[in-house]
């Protein structure tokens, strides 16, 4: 029996500085593996600003080119391009969901162009990752590392949809820089990238582009057609000449189709790349040639199909197919099927199937899974809770059964999960897993425990943000995109509505993340959570941030007691309806209602009220007050008389 203790650590750092219109951003990942070796990988650093008159962005530093026409290329240099965030929300492109099946608590890493762009931990069973910050046009390489060290790898194609934009619309991308390789042995060199897309009318879109360096050239031309209900089709041809490899030249033809059939709620995405000659190469192919050697497989055809079918109340079907043929290698194919629905309105049922086949290595993976989830939190009065059963047909033809209990608590701040898995063949793979995460105003804490016959794992982590601003330092949850700095004039412990765990700190600040750029965002404070000694004129603030901006959401608050006062004049007659009441040396005011009653907030324990019901001195008075009679809901009730 072999026993060992191993530790691994992971930290993702994403510092940023906003100075006027400029956004300075950096991303890096530090890892220390089980072997004790540590590594820091700098993903990118750049400065960027919006140019509103051009609906564009100017970027200086490290990033990747656009990918509507050519494959995305990592670079270090300068880029001026149309900003997608300035395009109406419904016309934006979204990243495909990465789906897979983990056999245990596993680490999932997603790479693009060799760089890790996303890393997370998933529980055993099917997973779906939809918030990956990928660059369109480059495949995503997914690595799933199980708790026993076994690794499964697969690729998720990320093909740009059919190119078709509205009449008169213009999109462009101009980049000058140096190729930024992941591998140190790759070729290095300056290059330029230029693409332009123009909508001639509602039917026809034209586009062209060039990628060039001292030893490489590629040119493309194509047209996109918008057939409305019949969908959008784009057809283009690309020519390349590789001076790094004896001036080999080649060409490729690409057809892309995208359509949404609104009558049937069916979405089609089809892309086919036909490489007319073996010598065609992308810019990355030419620059990475030294890394390929004997495994330099040349693609002949690459076809991907995705169909999403909504059945309204009867569920959602998602089908993906991909087949790649090579000039000098046998075929590869990948298929994924997923269907989910609700039974009896609240019981969730999901069935999935993933298949990968590489005929060259005779390597085949075939995984089937099914699960059913039953909510019962209301039965035991414990927030939301679900009991879930899942069965998986593993790659080794064994059957894994698992039962899990998961749910949310503390106003959706706490997420928890307990899972027990049993394998039909290998009882050493039976596992018990526990995991939880807790959202706070300063971030999200998570913890996990995983035990099997051979392995015991436990770990924890925290992610969040630290914001330095003109009034101090504020901790918050992880910032994604634009964010708002909540400012409540020093009022603490105020909850932001529909943002679990976001509460103002001792200085009255909080961070709200995930705001939409270039559109109105309404941020509400939760009225029921405001303390009895705090008053807020308006519990809503509306902001329209630019991309990656940090905007201030200001709320006018007053500290002090609240009271319903009955005011009498010198003759013990109730003060007239509509009279104005103010507090000496404070901004608190009120209007007298029926029977001389007025609601006031922001009051000290004692003070002087000024009451005015006319212009002359006989139509106003002062009333000293002391708050003594506190009623329910934190309200005081007093009867006061003019002096």
Language-model features: where?
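Transmembrane beta-strand segments of Gram-negative outer membrane beta-barrel proteins
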Residues: 1-11, 17-26, 164-184, 204-206, ...
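Conserved structural position at the C-terminal beta-strand
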Residues: 144, 611-613
